[in-house]
């Protein structure tokens, strides 16, 4: 165990972290298979250095299930009007499950048609976009991922949040070399970074956010108001 000025940190093996997160999610009524998918996505984010989309979000997801904001056992429905396009209704389930299923369906369609496009709706936060990009890359495909987001960013010169951060990503296999993976957002920083700073009692870098008066702030709590 190592210690910083703000808090102590414990280091565990990835497999142990996955088992822990799986146990937490099954305790909320999520099936073993789905809980394992969620856990793997969270741990993968931590392993890639994206702590804002890793296990730090586990308490939030648990709370959302308990409050009835997310379905622990969704009944997703796929509509496929043409051979290479489909629409997936996530039934308000976890975004990880919807995203995984949507990309797998896109891969299946690409296997037979050369391309696959899936639009998902009635979903929730799906974590790190790179997860689904890598899913496609491992199958040998180029991939694009886009998602919407609630309004959070003010337009240039404004102070009211009117624009969503709406992350997007692209990836391409590179043979024996590591794949190209782009996972980004129009925002300066993910809101999760600000939440993590607030949790740790740390200031955020200047330029990350504005307070409720439209002034630049380094106070994470003020930035989240």
Give residue spans per PLM region.
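Phosphate/diphosphate-binding glycine-rich loops and adjacent basic-rich segments that engage nucleotide
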Residues: 153-224
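Active-site cofactor/substrate anionic-group-binding motifs, chiefly glycine-
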Residues: 54-107
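Generic N-terminal amphipathic, Lys/Arg-enriched alpha-helix
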Residues: 2-28
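N-terminal and secondary-structure boundary signal
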Residues: 26-29, 47-51
């Amino acid at each position: 165990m190592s210690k910083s000025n703000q808090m102590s940190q414990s280091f565990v093996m990835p497999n142990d972290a996955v088992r822990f997160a799986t146990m937490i999610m099954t305790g909320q009524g999520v099936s073993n298979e789905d809980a394992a998918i969620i856990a793997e996505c969270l741990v993968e984010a931590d392993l890639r250095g994206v702590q804002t989309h890793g296990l730090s979000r586990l308490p939030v997801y648990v709370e959302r299930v308990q409050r009835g904001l997310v379905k622990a056992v969704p009944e997703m429905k796929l509509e496929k009007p043409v051979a290479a396009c489909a629409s997936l209704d996530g039934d308000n389930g976890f975004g990880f499950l919807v995203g995984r299923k949507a990309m797998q369906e896109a891969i299946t369609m690409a296997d037979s048609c050369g391309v696959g496009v899936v639009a998902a709706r009635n979903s929730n936060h799906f974590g790190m976009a790179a997860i689904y990009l890598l899913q496609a890359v491992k199958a040998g495909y180029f991939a694009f991922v886009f998602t919407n987001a609630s309004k959070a960013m003010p337009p240039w010169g404004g102070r009211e949040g009117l624009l969503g951060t709406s992350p997007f990503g692209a990836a391409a296999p590179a043979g024996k070399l590591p794949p190209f993976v782009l996972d980004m957002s129009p925002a300066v920083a993910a809101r999760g970074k600000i939440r993590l700073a607030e949790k740790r009692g740390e200031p955020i870098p200047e330029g990350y956010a504005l307070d409720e008066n439209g002034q630049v702030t380094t106070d994470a709590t003020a930035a989240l108001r």
